[in-house]
Amino acid sequence: MKLKDTGLTFQDIKDKVNKYMIETYERFDFLAETAEDMYIYDENGTPYLDFYAGIAVNSAGNCNPKVVAAVKDQVEDIMHTFNYPYTIPQALLAEKVCETIGMDKIFYQNSGTEANEAMIKMARKYGIEKYGPNRYHIVTAKMGFHGRTFGAMSATGQPGNGCQVGFGPMTYGFSYAPYNDLQAFKDACTENTIAIMVEPVQGEGGVHPATMEFMQGLRKFCDENDMLLLIDEVQTGWCRTGAVMSYMNYGIKPDIVSMAKALGGGMPIGAICATAEVAKAFSAGSHGTTFGGHPVSCAAALAEVNELLDRDLAGNAKKVGDYFASKLEKLPHVKEVRHQGLLVGVEFDDTIGGVDVKHGCLDRKLLITAIGAHIIRMIPPLIVTEEDCDKAVAIIEDTIKSLEK
């Protein structure tokens, strides 16, 4: 939809949003009207260099032509049914995902938080059915983030964070331990613990990758204690971190893994994959969804996954991510650069505010975001080049210099 075809102005659009929408977002003051590859364009055709990819969604590029074509083709065949009949996109995507990442079964959802809800439910049901009614406890990481629905929100180890404040008591059955502290996780487990649930990189927590010792230690500890290892790959999954799934960087395999974002290439979809044994916890009636496995979303996801794999965008994420980090480390006021592939966080010293850098970059037509007082995060499409990174670094440097004045 183009603004010129509506007879409205950009201010009219903003007025309608302010009047009718419940706003929980700090809006950027521009209209995203069209997009292609590494750029988003406003109503005047002004390009914005996209280093956020719709929050790690558009990994094969904005409006990837093969994804767009898959959506158009599927819309003309069948847009929606329910999960009683079989559909071709569901079946083909299930095979592609499971065979690619080495898991046995998949269950479709609509989003990342729903995928994490399903993962929590499956783990608890598995524990209760196999070991008895008290085996439902799950240990998660402090400063993690798993979503905004009640189970996922309760699993988020940030008591007092805005996503938890004001909603009353959290769902019972979770404990939190410091990230990358293997012994603390072991100590947090009890005889009632059925699972440990972590992100391989804490994105919202400031872009902190897990250590090899931590991830391999969790896998070993879970194996030794009849516990499940749940890995949240909503943000890290599908080539973002230099491997198809981030857990592959650690040479381990989860019992259940959640995914969303990049899986759909811009269409809403989430999923969990599980081992055959754990997947048996779900049977008819134990979980369900109206829109999960939507034919159009599955068609888009299949096209997106094929693009990511055929173009080796995991390899590009590793190569360009290392290059980008090396350039960012040379900027003034940079305290630390943390990254895994193209999930990149830059922490500045106390004189530079992350939000100030974010807004300064927006003024210079670069889209990034801020997390924490002095941290910016960048999650560009995985088609990004070293030249794109050079442009971004130059804009960030110019912004930093303007904040020194």
Question: Which role does the model predict for each range below?
Answer:
Residues M1-K405:
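Conserved N-terminal phosphate-binding loop of PLP-dependent enzymes in the Aspartate aminotransferase
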